[in-house]
Each structure stands twice: as structure tokens, then as C-alpha cells.
């Protein structure tokens, strides 16, 4: 007989992140372009999520360290970025998530933000995992595009061995040949199992990247962000990870995948309705 899986709850302040709880929205800018833009985007998300009663965490990067071209905009850097994050937290009372790329960044970043993120390309770097684990912060682990869902258990185990079990797993698509990504929704349950019920979320905007094989920046398919997000929530997820911009065509990074800020409210109305419906169903075991 197959016993039901226990869903682990990870707390971000008073926000509970779990696969059987109402979905949490991790959303904001791909990269900090300016203090004023960050304030504008964060304020809009706070207003909409308060109205719809959706738990919310602001996301952005202070340094996009893995841009395709050395000439691409990377961000304001850690020092200025942390000042902006601190101001957002003070002004709007919002929780914040951002990524770290180097060992020395883990501690100072964790002292300001509420969740630190392990980037997909760095997810198997043991020294970085150890440094992040030691902060005691909640960790969001991006699943590498090249890694199977089952292999995520090894990364979770690394964090546990280093004393941190406050782990969220984030799917951002899987390589499908060259320069294309697909989302394997069957993999969500595998990640839940190998992580012993850790929360699993979907990065629906990054998963829509579609590269020009000879280009210096990613293309994208933002016209499909709603359908991909619905597909993820239909499986039963702890949250969505969404990037947005007031003018995606002018965004300094990943604009082709970004949800227009003007579409945030109708988008979230749909997502909340679907999530509420899916999580109202009793668990159905079809294995026996």
C-alpha cells in the first residue's frame, strides 16, 4: 500500500510555503534596473496580491552573473542591490528573495533578504551549497536545465547534511535539444518525493526562454505564460515564480519572457481560481 506523502511546510516569516497550501507568488523584476523601477513594480504586486489575498515575496537579482554576452547589463551589484531590497522591505513590509553566485555573498545577502536562491547553473557546487546552508536562511534551489527531477534529491541532501532543511525546489524548464526548454509536469511529483515533501514551485517565465542559437541574448514566449502557469498549478504546486516589467520590450534582461505589469491582476485572478479549485479536491490515489 502506498502511503500519502507528507508535505513539508517552509516558513518565510508568516508565509507558509507547502504543496498543499495556497500558492505563494514569488514575483518582480528579472534584475534591478533602478531603485525607482523596483519601487514601482513591488508596489503594484503588493497592491494586487493584498487585494486577491495571495501570499507574496518580491524577487529580483542584484547581479546577473551568467549573462550570455559580456556586454549585457548585469545589475547594480551587491552593495547597491541590498540597499534597494532593504528599502523595499521597510516601505512595503514585503519579503524578498534574491540569488547569490559566490561564497562570500551568502552571509551578507542573507542578513538583508528573506530567501536566498541557488542558481540553476550552480546547483551542484558543494562549497556554495555549504556557505548558503550555514546562513540558516530559507533556500530556493533552481533545478538545472540539464538535471533530471530525481537528481534534485542529492542537492536537498547536501543542504540537510550542512544543517539546513528549509528548502524550496524550483523548476525552470529542462533542455529539449539545443536552445529550447520544456516543462515536464510529471517531474514535479518526483521532486516532491526525493525531497521528502519539500515545496515545489514553477518558474514559468524562465521556462519560456527560447534562444537564438547564434544570438547574444535569450528570446522568449511570454504569450504562453498563463497557459504554462495553469499547467503547473493544475498538478498542485507550492508557488509560482514570475518575472514582470512595465515594458517588457525595453527590459534590460529577459524581456521576451516577462509578464507585462499591466496583466498581473487578471493573470493572478486566473491562477488563484485554479489553485483554489485544485486544492479543494481530496487526494486521489490511483496506484492501488
UniProtKB/Swiss-Prot annotation:
Disulfide cross-links: none
Principal EC category: transferase
Subcellular location field: Cytoplasm
GO cellular-component term (any): cytoplasm
Pathway the protein takes part in: Carbohydrate biosynthesis; 3-deoxy-D-manno-octulosonate biosynthesis; 3-deoxy-D-manno-octulosonate from D-ribulose 5-phosphate: step 2/3; Bacterial outer membrane biogenesis; lipopolysaccharide biosynthesis
Chief place of localization: cytoplasm
GO MF term (any one): 3-deoxy-8-phosphooctulonate synthase activity
InterPro entries from the UniProt entry: Aldolase_TIM, DAHP1/KDSA, KDO8P_synthase
Database matches in Pfam families: DAHP_synth_1
EC number in record: 2.5.1.55
Reaction(s) the record says it catalyses: D-arabinose 5-phosphate + phosphoenolpyruvate + H2O = 3-deoxy-alpha-D-manno-2-octulosonate-8-phosphate + phosphate
Keywords (A to Z) from UniProt: Cytoplasm, Lipopolysaccharide biosynthesis, Transferase
Domain of life: Bacteria
Signal peptide extent: none
BP GO annotations: keto-3-deoxy-D-manno-octulosonic acid biosynthetic process
Family: Belongs to the KdsA family.
Protein name, per record: 2-dehydro-3-deoxyphosphooctonate aldolase
Species name: Bdellovibrio bacteriovorus (strain ATCC 15356 / DSM 50701 / NCIMB 9529 / HD100)
Upper classification of the organism: Bacteria, Pseudomonadati, Bdellovibrionota, Bdellovibrionia, Bdellovibrionales
Amino acid at each position: 500500500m502506498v502511503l500519502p506523502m507528507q508535505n513539508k511546510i517552509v516558513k518565510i516569516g508568516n508565509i507558509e510555503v507547502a504543496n498543499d497550501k495556497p500558492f505563494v507568488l514569488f514575483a518582480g523584476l528579472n534584475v534591478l534596473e533602478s531603485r525607482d523601477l523596483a519601487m514601482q513594480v513591488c508596489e503594484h504586486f503588493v497592491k494586487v496580491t493584498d487585494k486577491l489575498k495571495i501570499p507574496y515575496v518580491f524577487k529580483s537579482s542584484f547581479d546577473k552573473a551568467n549573462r550570455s554576452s559580456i556586454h549585457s547589463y548585469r545589475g547594480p551589484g551587491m552593495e547597491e542591490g541590498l540597499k534597494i531590497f532593504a528599502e523595499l522591505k521597510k516601505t512595503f513590509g514585503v519579503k524578498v528573495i534574491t540569488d547569490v553566485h559566490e561564497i562570500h555573498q551568502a552571509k551578507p545577502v542573507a542578513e538583508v533578504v528573506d530567501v536566498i536562491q541557488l542558481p540553476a547553473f550552480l546547483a551542484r557546487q558543494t562549497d556554495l551549497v555549504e556557505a548558503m546552508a550555514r546562513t540558516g536562511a530559507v533556500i530556493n534551489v533552481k533545478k538545472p536545465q540539464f538535471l533530471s527531477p530525481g537528481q534534485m534529491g542529492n542537492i536537498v541532501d547536501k543542504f540537510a547534511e550542512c544543517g539546513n532543511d528549509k528548502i524550496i525546489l524550483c523548476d525552470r524548464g529542462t533542455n529539449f535539444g539545443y536552445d529550447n526548454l520544456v516543462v515536464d509536469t510529471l517531474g514535479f511529483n518526483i521532486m516532491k518525493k526525493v525531497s521528502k515533501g519539500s515545496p515545489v514551485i514553477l518558474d514559468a517565465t524562465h521556462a519560456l526562454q527560447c534562444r537564438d542559437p547564434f544570438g547574444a541574448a535569450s528570446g522568449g514566449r511570454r504569450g504562453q505564460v498563463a497557459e504554462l502557469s495553469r499547467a503547473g498549478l493544475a498538478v498542485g504546486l507550492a508557488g509560482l515564480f514570475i518575472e514582470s516589467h512595465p515594458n517588457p520590450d525595453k527590459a534590460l534582461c529577459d524581456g521576451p519572457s516577462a509578464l507585462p505589469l499591466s496583466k498581473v491582476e487578471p493573470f493572478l485572478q486566473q491562477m488563484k481560481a485554479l489553485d483554489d479549485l485544485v486544492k479543494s479536491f481530496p487526494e486521489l490515489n490511483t496506484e492501488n
